[in-house]
C-alpha cells in the first residue's frame, strides 16, 4: 500500500473487511471464526497505521509475531482505511477504527437507514463522520425494461430475501426492481443520474459503478457513464 501510494501520489484508499470464504483463512494458517476475523481486521488497521507513520514496530499476539519491522518507502500521506460491509456491525467497526464505510450491493432504503446508524456510531466514538461510499450494480440502456433484461434481476431480488440480508429494510418482501433500487441502478442515463443524486442527498460521498453484469457490452456502458452520466452528475 505504501509503495502504491508513492507511485500514485497519495491517491490510494485501503479497503478492509472480514472476508467471506473460510478456506482462504485456512490456507493462510489463520483461524476463521467471526471473532478471529474481526480481531484480524482491527489489528491489521492498527499495524498499518503504525508502520505508515514511520514507526519501527515489534508486535506479538496469537496472530502475528515480528520484531523491528519498518516500512520503506513511506506513503505520501496517511492512507485512509474504509471498512467494507453493509451490516450494522460493519458500521460499528468503521466508526471504531476506520476512516470510511463502503457497502457493496445495498438497497437505497437500507443505505439511508445504515448511514443514520453510522453517524450515531461515529458520534459515540467521539470521531468526525467518516467518508460514505457505495458500489451499486449499474445497467444503462435505452429504457428500464431493456436495462433490467441485461442483468440477473430475479437473482438479485432473490439475494435480497436471503437470511444473510436480514438487516435490510423490508427483508423477505423483495419482489420488484423498486425493492432493490440502489443495489441496482438501471434504466436510461438520466435514471442513473437521478439515483446517484438520491444517494448523494442521503449522505454518499464516493460511488463506484459496478459494471460486472454488463461484460458483454462493457464499452457501451463506459460510454454511457463517461459521456452522459458523469457530466450530468457533476453539473447537478
Language model features: what each stretch is:
Residues 1-236:
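Active-site-adjacent structural elements that line small-molecule/cofactor binding pockets in enzymes
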